[in-house]
Each structure stands twice: as structure tokens, then as C-alpha cells.
Amino acid sequence: MATLIEVRDLLALSGRMDAQRISEQLATPMPLVNAMLSRLEAMGKAERQEEWLSGCLSGSCRHCPEGKACRKEVWQLR
């Protein structure tokens, strides 16, 4: 089980990561990682950002049948 400090340190070392990758790296359940990231965000230590993947061929994401599949939420330290 990871601690809040370990999550912060991993973000500091990697720069930007998504919650799934943090969960895998620290061998910690996803709900716990999400809770810790939300806590870091509330403390003003981390921020979430949306990243658009470059796999969109049509350019019309609003009407895309994939919905939000081309969006990825990443976290970084402030």
C-alpha cells in the first residue's frame, strides 16, 4: 500500500502520469490512488489536466461515436 508522500514523489520524478499508471507503479488499488490524488489536489500540491490523444482522424470529437475515448486525464505537481 502506498502513502500520499509516495504518490507525490512518483509525480515529482515522472512529471506527468495518469492514475492508472500510478496505481500500477505503486501496486495500489485505483480507488485509493484516486482518493490520494484528489487529496493532493485539495491541498494545492497537484493538478489534473486533460490531454488529447492524437488518434482522432476526423477532427469532429463532439460527434465522435467513441465519446471521450481520445481524452486522457493526467496529473502533475504544481
From Swiss-Prot:
<feature type="binding site">
    <location>
        <position position="64"/>
    </location>
    <ligand>
        <name>iron-sulfur cluster</name>
    </ligand>
</feature>
<keyword id="KW-0479">Metal-binding</keyword>
<keyword id="KW-0411">Iron-sulfur</keyword>
<dbReference type="InterPro" id="IPR023732">
    <property type="entry name" value="FeoC"/>
</dbReference>
<keyword id="KW-0804">Transcription</keyword>
<protein>
    <recommendedName>
        <fullName>Probable [Fe-S]-dependent transcriptional repressor</fullName>
    </recommendedName>
</protein>
<keyword id="KW-0678">Repressor</keyword>
<keyword id="KW-0238">DNA-binding</keyword>
<comment type="similarity">
    <text>Belongs to the FeoC family.</text>
</comment>
<comment type="function">
    <text>May function as a transcriptional regulator that controls feoABC expression.</text>
</comment>
<feature type="binding site">
    <location>
        <position position="70"/>
    </location>
    <ligand>
        <name>iron-sulfur cluster</name>
    </ligand>
</feature>
<feature type="binding site">
    <location>
        <position position="61"/>
    </location>
    <ligand>
        <name>iron-sulfur cluster</name>
    </ligand>
</feature>
<feature type="binding site">
    <location>
        <position position="56"/>
    </location>
    <ligand>
        <name>iron-sulfur cluster</name>
    </ligand>
</feature>
<dbReference type="GO" id="GO:0003677">
    <property type="term" value="F:DNA binding"/>
</dbReference>
<dbReference type="InterPro" id="IPR036388">
    <property type="entry name" value="WH-like_DNA-bd_sf"/>
</dbReference>
<dbReference type="Pfam" id="PF09012">
    <property type="entry name" value="FeoC"/>
</dbReference>
<dbReference type="InterPro" id="IPR015102">
    <property type="entry name" value="Tscrpt_reg_HTH_FeoC"/>
</dbReference>
<dbReference type="GO" id="GO:0005506">
    <property type="term" value="F:iron ion binding"/>
</dbReference>
<keyword id="KW-0408">Iron</keyword>
<dbReference type="GO" id="GO:0051536">
    <property type="term" value="F:iron-sulfur cluster binding"/>
</dbReference>
<dbReference type="InterPro" id="IPR036390">
    <property type="entry name" value="WH_DNA-bd_sf"/>
</dbReference>
<keyword id="KW-0805">Transcription regulation</keyword>
